[in-house]
Amino acid sequence: MAAQGYEVRVFNLIDPSQSDGYNPFSYIHSEKDVLTLIDNLIKNTTPRNASSNDPFWEKAEIALDSALMLYPVSEAPPEEQNFEMLIYMMNFAEVREEDDQYRSPLDMLFRALEEEQPNHVAVKQYKAFKQAAGKTAKSILVSAAVRLATFNIPQYARMTMVDEMDFGSLGEKKKAIFCVIPVDDSSMNYLVGMLYTQCFQALYRRADEKHNGRLPVPVRVIQDEWANVAQPESYPKILATCRSYNIGLNIIVQNIQQIKALYEKEWESIIGNCDTLLFLGGGNEPTSLEFIVKLLGKETIATRTRGQTKGRSGSSSTNFQQTGRDLMTIDEVRKLDTHKAILFIRGEDPVLDKKYNIKRHPNIKLTTDGKAKPYIHKPQGAPDYACLLYT
């Protein structure tokens, strides 16, 4: 791609030494952006099946995290606006259960800010957190620290210190961003979830502010492993509106159940907002098979039967009958030839066609499948940052 004039960026959670920098703080333009980012962080680091009968804990943690994020955004220089600084600030937080009058260094920092700017939103959020009693506040601190533990790991802290992504420029020039995530460990995938959220926000903002609501260069978002990375809270709305911004989304899932698991009430809307659906076959998941059969519709079969009676009073009769049947049965869909696929395009009849043989692509020679050497990405950032990544 680089040879074709593309600017290539990589966010690599498997090998941070081959990753460009992504700093979520670089995309914060308002208090609302902070709350959106924190909400995304909380949701992406909370187990899917976890439930809490008391929303107080989550709200209190959101108040603390947003206060810690809002402070450097408004009071610190750009080079200190990152998660490493947030962790540094959190290290000065302390709660003593037996002494309600104790003031930690972090308490004094926000007290000083309050004296200068009593209506500062960071002060308000921190005071909301401090309403918790000693033992409760300590539990909230522990929960927040555990949630942000990733940034205690030097290589991950470094890759989020500076930003080299510039998401908005995706819609203005030839540029590609690759997200590399572990197959066997999803604990870090929330970072990609944050990246998705801010990428869409940046593209929409760039389109509205500079290009009258439509990006000059089409942006295609290919979301492989879609089900393993938490999507933005407003994903169904993004899917419904992105086309007008010249953005296209490709959702890749193993089966329909993966969509239903994430969006139980909106899964049909998500599929309905996709103009094209490509079924590659395979799998025995009943919901997906039934869905494809229903989507294919029915065909009409004309039947002609003829009867004849021999003898002195012989007679004959012909009967025509039309019956309907599924275009393909569940069993036929399940046994679909592995070399074929079913394509659904809005407003058109379904198409059963052969899959393209990727080995025949003229650029296959540039991939490892075509015997080429694996691509090793060299971070494009400042030399000192690149050196830090390799220490």
Question: How does the language model describe each region?
Answer:
Residues 239-342:
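Conserved ATP-driven motor cores of ASCE-family P-loop NTPases powering translocation/secretion/packaging/pilus
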Residues 1-247, 262, 272, 323, ...:
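P-loop NTPase motor domains
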